[in-house]
Amino acid sequence: YALFHLVTVFPLSWIQLYDTRPVESFLLVQMGGAVLAALGILASGYIADKVGRRTTLGTLAPPIALFSVFVPSLIDGGTTGQNTFILVGFTLLGLSYGQAAGATTSNFQKHFRYTGAALTSDLAWLVGAAFAPLVALGLSANFGLGYVSLYLLSAAVATLAALSLNRKLEIRD
């Protein structure tokens, strides 16, 4: 969920504070990115039907980790770099977001399954992403954009760890 705010709220703040690009033009690119995210959500459903939700999420964590390496050069790379950051980031977001909540359903007994998954998803959103824009802006302002890369990388690693734990805790009905 950290990726969500790192391609939506954080870059708007960063552009407003540290770049000369008009925020309005950046918002147009974000709207295009939102379309890519929506297509990614649909594609993730198709992919997950073939290989499973956890496998889909686990397969997407390494590309998100790789993407994190390029955060500084893309955000600080002028209009082309920033647009690439948004479009690639939203695509990865859509592909992973589509399966995030559903991947936890197997951890709950049948009659608690969807309530448990909803609560887990909401809490993950709050803990994993609620402060992401503020943390990313603070890191970039005080230490440089490279620390935003480390932040996103830590989220990808945490995803892989959580998926591993999720598999071990799966409840079979």
Q: Which residue ranges define each predicted feature?
A:
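A late C-terminal transmembrane helix in Major Facilitator Superfamily
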Residues: 111-140
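A membrane-interface helix-boundary motif in multi-pass transporters
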Residues: 138-154
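Intracellular juxtamembrane helix-capping segments at the cytosolic ends
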Residues: 96-108
